[in-house]
Amino acid sequence: MPVDDQFTALHRAVLECAAAGCESIWINCNNDKVKLIRHTIGEYVEDPVYYNRHYAKFSSELKKYIPIFYCPNHPNDINKRDSYSWGVINAAMNANRSASKISRHLIPNKFYVAFPFGVYNPWVVQKHRRTIRSPQNFYLSCNGKTVKDGEYLGFTFDQKDLKAFKEHIKKTNTPAYKALSEFKSGGKWMERQPANERYSARFFTIDKIVKS
């Protein structure tokens, strides 16, 4: 979705993450869109705080690059729980998994979420960097509403929250089959649910997991 010439809604979300002080950026997307998005967005973005230090001595050496990684949905999740809310969880799990393969000390203790559908200035979060890095969760608000009200506004969560998000999806997602009775009696004891009732996590909005 283009916002301006050569600037898309996804560029806006990446810029917001950079302004928030993220050390790496993880983009969740469908597997068939990874190459296109990588070609459009690239492999890194410069930290705007360091980018604007034009008058510093050797300013080119002070640049800080933030790597961008792409997280396709797992085949087992497609058409089962690949909602926008699951995308947040999937990106965080990919960040954890990749970091743990190098060192447990690299596992992030906090995550910042930015949405392509956000319609606010991405620079507003830069002045809140210290708060975003603090132990308390951070929520952008507009007219008293936050992501908990279903608004596409930036927020943070930690590893404890991530665990709660995953548990909520696991407990509330409806399976493809439901039990007819506790024990087998004569005929079948499981039946396939109607298509519109299977895998309800496909339709979970972001507020459904954040409020869990």
What label would you give each PLM region?
Residues 36, 47, 54-172:
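Conserved beta-loop-beta/alpha segment of the NTase-like Rossmann-fold superfamily
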Residues 16, 23, 43-46, 61-64, ...:
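Glutamate identity and glutamate-enriched acidic tracts
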Residues 1-57:
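N-terminal glycine-rich phosphate-binding loop and ensuing alpha1 helix
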Residues 19-21, 104-108, 128-135, 183-197, ...:
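Flexible, charged surface loops at secondary-structure boundaries
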Residues 4-7, 123-124, 208:
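Solvent-exposed, flexible loop/coil residues
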Residues 155-212:
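Conserved alpha/beta core of the MobA/IspD/sugar-nucleotide pyrophosphorylase nucleotidyltransferase superfamily
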